Amino acid sequence: MSAFHEERVLSVHHWTDRLFSFTTTRDTALRFSNGHFTMIGLKVDGKPLLRAYSIASANYEETLEFLSIKVQDGPLTSRLQHIQVGDSIIVGKKPTGTLLIDYLLPGKRLYLLATGTGLAPFMSVIRDPETYEKFEQVILVHGVREVKELAYHDYITQELPKHEFLGEMISQQLLYYPTVTREPYKHQGRVTTAIETDQIAKALNVPPLNAAEDRVMICGSPEMLRDLKAMMEKRGLKEGNTTTPGDFVIERAFAEAK
């Protein structure tokens, strides 16, 4: 029995020359939790070429969505960036990962801290009704280099608040903090700096991030993961995992897969 489903590409969106997303069909047997990743890829010379990708779509949706960087000499993304509607993609049957609400202790606010394509799992998490049932406020922070790399910005700010089922909760509970490092923008600087200086809390008018009330999910570059882990621990937050819930969780399975 194969470890993969073969899916068909339904749409492709190129955000920039370095960033694209795509949707595929979804086998009815595929089950996952919001925040999970799975192995996806292409068959090259008859063999599967795979990388770990977070699932950006919610687990109740009939299609799958993925967000990817383009690396010209990357074994997979150099090929994946050229996919077109109707092409075949292979998708692993066993999604997994640590960015699940179940791996966090109860809290008042949920911070979702992402850089680059680390946003993908949080697009799934912010479309989960349970997220808003368990936390009073959900704070999505996305750090990129250039404004055009703020994938899903318009969807988050304009479409999600009108969502048929989640719109009211999202309008009242979701706070979005996009930040850019290489261009003038309303929020500038690295995510790590914004956390360290309590810049986010000030801008969103919430208390400084603290162990008593806040829970955190982190997904991004290895440097960002390392720095934020140290900052969380300095503030007294304890890391959780698949066996022991904690105050923050980190996805280490991949760092911008190529």
Could you describe each region identified by the protein language model?
Residues L110-L113, M217:
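Conserved beta-strand elements of the Class I
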Residues T38, I89-G92:
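Generic structural signal for buried aliphatic residues
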Residues T115-P121:
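Ser/Thr-glycine-rich phosphate-binding loops at phosphate-binding pockets of nucleotides
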Residues P95-L105:
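A short, basic/flexible loop-to-alpha-helix module at the beginning of a structural domain
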Residues G35, G118, S221:
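Short, conserved phosphate/pyrophosphate- and ester-handling motifs at nucleotide-, phospho-/glycolipid
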Residues S2-V85:
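Ferredoxin-reductase
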Residues P121-E133:
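Histidine-anchored nucleotide/phosphate-binding helix
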Residues S2-A3, V141, K148-K258:
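Reductase modules of NAD(P)H-dependent flavoproteins
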